[in-house]
UniProtKB/Swiss-Prot annotation:
Residues annotated as binding Mn(2+) 1: D83, G84
Organism: Drosophila mojavensis
Record-level GO cellular component terms: mitochondrion
Cofactor(s) annotated in UniProt: Mg(2+); Mn(2+)
Record-listed Mn(2+) 2 binding positions: D83, D228
Entries under PROSITE patterns matching the protein: PPM_2
PPM-type phosphatase domain residues: 42-306
Alphabetical UniProt keywords: Hydrolase, Magnesium, Manganese, Metal-binding, Protein phosphatase
Protein name: Protein phosphatase PTC7 homolog fig
Gene expressing this chain: fig
């Protein structure tokens, strides 16, 4: 008998989903044994998805209009998230497909033998340039955040354009958090390919504008990479409190459990009408009449633990 995830109970489908993620991530890291690595766990939720429609989302690296990728080579570990801008829907354009294509290109460039993870902004530049040159081009807009681990010196490099972002935690405290890039309230910097060359496109930012950083990381550090569906709904203090017990955690199943809970938390708070969410606070600071409550949105989260093997 053939079955799909929709034939299963929600709980069973989650187990299948989590096991599938772990299989994919474990198989991507076997060739880098003995080198510094990122032990990764991934989860997400589309604001429109059915409660049990998980496996498809993982298989095509999409959660609604969000997309993601992870890559592992002997020189570098690379992770990325992209958030397609939903405003294109009124023109019949799926920005989720744009975000997915951008992440696919980033993944392919990250797998090149010469790429060592030291310049994720160039990775973003090359990937976006390739999108613009495609004959059957994919149109839309997306934010993007790339984080790479340069294995040789155990340095984390990043390139962030827009309001997705990442945090690095050490010993239960925030070591680094990326800054948002906004044109105005709820209007992030974004990469755009318009459907027509002459089409007026106000928000056509350049990948060269991505903010970069580099951080020396060590055993046990945690890296949290996510789209704004997480950061707009879960305050930093709650994220830190949730992640504090995971310092030094290298068991993938424990990281997966933690990232599952983060997504569940963000989803619950996004639907709240009473919670004072980070998005509501930003709206108030911008003199917007938003009141209180969360922001229903697609959510994509990658949680990674830095593992530096002992040198024998």
């Amino acid at each position: 008998m053939f079955f799909t995830v929709r034939n299963l109970s929600n709980r069973t489908s989650q187990v299948v989903n989590y096991a599938y993620i772990q299989y994919r991530l474990l198989s991507s890291t076997t060739k880098t044994k003995g080198l510094p690595r990122l032990i990764k766990a991934i989860q997400g939720s589309s604001k429109d998805q059915l409660a049990d429609d998980h496996l498809h989302m993982i298989d095509d690296h999409r959660y609604g209009e969000d997309s993601w990728f992870v890559s592992s080579t002997p020189k570098a570990e690379t992770m990325g998230v992209a958030d397609g801008v939903g405003g294109w829907r009124r023109l019949g354009i799926d920005s989720g497909l744009f975000a997915q294509e951008l992440m696919t290109n980033c993944s392919e460039f990250a797998e090149q033998p010469q790429y060592d993870g030291s310049d994720p902004r160039q990775l973003l530049i090359d990937s976006f340039d390739q999108m613009k040159k495609m004959s059957g081009k994919v149109c839309g807009s997306s934010t993007a955040c790339l984080v790479t681990l340069h294995r040789r010196d155990c340095t984390l490099h990043s390139a962030n354009l827009g309001d997705s972002g990442f945090m690095v935690l050490r010993n239960g405290k925030v070591l680094h958090r990326s800054d948002e890039q906004l044109h105005g309230f709820n209007t992030p910097y974004q990469l755009t390919v318009a459907p027509e060359p002459g089409m007026d496109c106000i928000l056509c930012d350049s990948p060269q504008q991505a903010v970069t950083s580099h951080i020396n990381v060590q055993q046990g550090d945690l890296v949290l990479l996510a789209t704004d569906g997480l950061f707009d709904n879960v305050p930093e203090s709650m994220l830190v409190r949730h992640l504090q017990p995971l310092h030094g955690e290298t068991r993938m199943e424990h990281l997966q459990h933690a990232v599952n809970r983060l997504v569940d938390m963000a989803k619950t708070l996004s639907l709240s009408n009473t919670f004072q969410s980070p998005f509501a606070l930003k709206a108030k600071a911008s003199n917007m009449n938003y009141g209180v409550g969360g922001k229903p949105d697609d959510i994509t989260v990658i949680l990674a633990s830095v593992d530096v093997p002992d040198k024998d």
